[in-house]
Amino acid sequence: FRSFRILFKQMESLYINTPPERIEGGLSFQHGFSTVVAAKHIGQDCRIFQQVTIGFNGTEQPVLEDRVEVSAGAIVIGNVCLHSDCVVGAGAVVVNDVNENTVVVGVPAKPIRLNRE
């Protein structure tokens, strides 16, 4: 097993490039390894899972409103807004705004249903 661990080291990095004054309370990371967050603003009680990228498209950054969930492996890029209570499914690539209370999946991300949590 030792050689396996040497060849396949787990990436344990969590990089946050959002100023603390632009992050509301309650932000949580579930297994935040290999995760990059460079949002313009992060609302209250957002949840971000592992291997997520939230970042620039060269000039603009995403906005996450309140109670947004970004699932494992998702990418949110550029001048987009994830409105309150939306969910981004695992592996989705978000390049457009996501409406309030909406679940999106796929590449590019498309709405599949309302979030009724």
Please place each PLM-identified region on the residue numbering.
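Terminal amphipathic alpha-helical/low-complexity segments used for targeting or macromolecular assembly
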Residues: 1-12, 117
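Structural signal for interior beta-strand "rungs" in well-ordered beta-sheet cores
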Residues: 10-112
